[in-house]
């Protein structure tokens, strides 16, 4: 059995939050944006009196991807009524990191609102994944109800394209990853979400989108021989994974934590959360792909670790991002909502061995 090891990287009370977004640049800089410390109150570290070019308003439930060392933010909700932001504010916002004159460390951000026509319906708690010159936006919560739509934005042409909608039910809080498969090419994988109940309703199932044929497929991976399937969940971690290690090379995605049961108070409260880690594995032979779930043995990076420095408490509504170095992916998890209804200030690194 492969092992998932958690390492506490930092604790910073000033950046405690949930419903934020995060990505890692090619230079290894981890960027956190948006979120809330208190329910329905977006956090903002900007000086509200500053003057200059337009910048995005504070928001929760947005997504952010890193492409060509620029950050691309779309979506979210904000304002007093916490409704989805309007067409102008929803984005796409591109952020370029400024560096100091005598250091390579970023000391500011230059924002630009990209112009386009016929963009997706504004929403929050959707999912995003980047690939080559495009990023995908999927599902989420508009002014009312939930969505199943999939859109693609090309950063070169600055054009949106609406693709085939995913299998029902519509959902918020789902997770998607983009992956290149030998027999398929580039695909998008989807797991979980919330549609009045935690998903998937059929244990272990996930959905695959084939961009070449603009078509969705529902997959039923084989279960873990001992633990079966990962439980239904939303607002969880679902991260792309790659490794040159022969033992780990079949792992394409990592699923972890997330909401197990929603709070009766809705967005104002905390439900119950998973604290597990699962590997989604695939093998290919003669152009036939086989999928399997495997539950990982979870341990602290320091075997003697105890308490808060050992392993993270179960949570949901956090930000996560993958980072590849030396041929292996590390997954980072920041903040999130705990069962105590408090927002975490922790940054954790997950490594699989």
Where do the language-model regions lie?
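Kelch-like beta-propeller repeat domains
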Residues: 1-353
């Amino acid at each position: 059995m492969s092992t998932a090891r958690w390492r506490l990287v930092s604790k910073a009370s000033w950046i405690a939050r949930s419903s934020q977004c995060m990505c890692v640049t090619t230079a290894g800089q981890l960027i956190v944006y948006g979120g809330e410390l208190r329910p329905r109150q977006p956090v903002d570290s900007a000086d509200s009196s500053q003057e200059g070019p337009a910048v995005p308003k504070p928001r929760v439930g947005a997504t952010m991807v890193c492409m060509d060392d620029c950050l691309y933010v779309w979506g979210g909700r904000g304002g007093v009524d916490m409704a989805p932001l309007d067409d102008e504010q929803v984005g796409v916002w591109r952020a370029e990191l400024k560096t100091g004159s005598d250091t390579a460390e970023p000391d500011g951000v230059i924002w630009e609102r990209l112009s386009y026509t016929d963009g997706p319906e504004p929403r929050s708690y959707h999912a995003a994944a980047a690939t080559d010159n495009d990023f995908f936006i999927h599902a989420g919560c508009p002014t009312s109800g939930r969505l199943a739509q999939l859109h693609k934005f090309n950063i070169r042409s600055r054009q949106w394209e609406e693709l085939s909608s995913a299998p029902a039910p519509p959902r918020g809080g789902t997770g998607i990853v983009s992956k290149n498969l030998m027999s398929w090419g580039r695909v998008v994988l989807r797991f979980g979400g919330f549609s009045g109940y935690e998903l998937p309703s059929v244990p272990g199932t996930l959905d695959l989108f084939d961009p070449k044929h603009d078509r969705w497929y529902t997959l039923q991976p084989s279960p873990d021989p001992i633990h079966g399937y990962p439980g239904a969940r939303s607002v969880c971690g679902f991260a792309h994974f790659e490794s040159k290690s022969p033992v780990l090379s079949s792992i394409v995605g990592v699923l972890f934590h997330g909401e197990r049961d929603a709070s009766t108070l809705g967005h104002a409260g905390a439900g119950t959360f998973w604290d597990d880690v699962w590997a989604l594995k695939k093998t290919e032979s003669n152009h036939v792909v086989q999928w399997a779930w495997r539950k990982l043995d979870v341990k602290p990076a320091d075997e003697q670790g105890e308490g808060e420095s050992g392993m993270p408490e179960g949570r949901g509504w956090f930000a996560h991002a993958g980072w590849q170095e030396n041929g292996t992916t590390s997954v980072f998890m920041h903040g999130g909502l705990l069962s105590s209804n408090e927002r975490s200030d922790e940054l954790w690194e997950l490594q699989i061995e």
